[in-house]
Amino acid sequence: MKVSPSVKRICENCRVIRRHGRVMVICVNPRHKQRQG
């Protein structure tokens, strides 16, 4: 899980979602998991 000030989609499988007021990226590739923090 990468925590960065700006989250971006890395590949076409990445999905940007909001969970509990946090913007997150979930993907089939676990290395692409990101959270805005």
From Swiss-Prot:
Record's keyword terms, sorted: Ribonucleoprotein, Ribosomal protein
State a single Gene Ontology molecular function: structural constituent of ribosome
SUPFAM superfamilies linked to this entry: Ribosomal protein L36
**One GO CC term, this protein:** ribonucleoprotein complex
Q: Which Pfam families match?
A: Ribosomal_L36
Q: Name one GO biological process term.
A: translation
Family of the protein in this entry: Belongs to the bacterial ribosomal protein bL36 family.
Q: Which HAMAP family match?
A: Ribosomal_bL36 (MF_00251)
Q: What is this protein called?
A: Large ribosomal subunit protein bL36
List the source organism. Answer: Bifidobacterium adolescentis (strain ATCC 15703 / DSM 20083 / NCTC 11814 / E194a)
